[in-house]
């Protein structure tokens, strides 16, 4: 397959790793692509800057030679936040580990009542499995925009399913709120990865983001069936 394409846009979580360890077969495939002078871009819906994801991959013992091109939804959102596109003051809905996405504007962080918009990077606690708390939390704030830095609904950390920011975003929309998404499957982030005319293929495990995103850009895709949808097959 690889001889037909110039550029490979590859998802990370569910393809390269499972949140706990690397997929050795996937690393071998990436190594072969690079040896054949193919352009490899890791495109992730991680709600953190690309540099933070690189650190995480280093902790999983992924070699730096593979990590030259990483783009995250958090990185794209961070650029927009610094331009104050949605107002100045924000409320952060998500775990503390995602604070790096707003590090440069951290002085503008405030509470729900005073904020101009809601910055959603996920649930407060990875282990939560009930979204009713968030429905109560947000019910009086649907007049504000919610910025979703990870459109994924769920992810598997090892064998454990966890909610992502996308699940809160969908809940917020169902309550009548407006959501602005950064990341896959939306076209803007793909335009940062390749130019028109490049023979490009996307590889991912999420039908709603990876494969839909490829379809939105009219590029080919490879679906990894033993990732986030594995229980459905």
Q: What residue ranges belong to the model's regions?
A:
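Asp-based, Mg2+/Mn2+-dependent phosphohydrolase catalytic module
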Residues: 2-35, 41-46, 51-71, 75-233
């Amino acid at each position: 397959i690889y001889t037909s394409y110039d550029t490979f846009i590859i998802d990370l979580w569910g393809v390269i790793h499972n949140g706990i360890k690397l997929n050795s077969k996937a690393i071998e495939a990436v190594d072969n692509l690079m040896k054949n002078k193919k352009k490899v871009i890791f495109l992730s819906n991680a709600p953190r800057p690309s540099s933070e994801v690189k650190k995480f991959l280093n902790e999983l013992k992924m070699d730096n030679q593979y990590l030259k091109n990483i783009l995250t939804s958090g990185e794209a959102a961070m650029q927009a936040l610094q331009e104050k596109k949605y107002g100045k003051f924000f409320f952060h809905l998500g775990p503390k580990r995602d604070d790096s996405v707003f590090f440069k504007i951290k002085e503008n962080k405030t509470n729900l009542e005073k904020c101009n918009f809601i910055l959603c990077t996920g649930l407060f606690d990875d282990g939560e499995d009930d979204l009713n708390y968030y429905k109560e939390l947000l019910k009086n704030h649907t007049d504000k925009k919610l910025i979703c830095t990870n459109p994924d609904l769920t992810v598997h950390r090892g064998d454990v399913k966890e909610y992502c920011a996308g699940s809160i975003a969908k809940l917020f929309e169902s309550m009548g709120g407006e959501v602005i998404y950064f990341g896959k499957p939306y076209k803007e982030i793909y335009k940062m990865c390749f130019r028109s005319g490049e023979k490009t293929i996307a590889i991912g495990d999420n039908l709603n983001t990876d494969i839909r995103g490829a379809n939105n850009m009219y590029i080919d895709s490879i679906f990894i069936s033993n990732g986030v949808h594995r229980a459905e097959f």
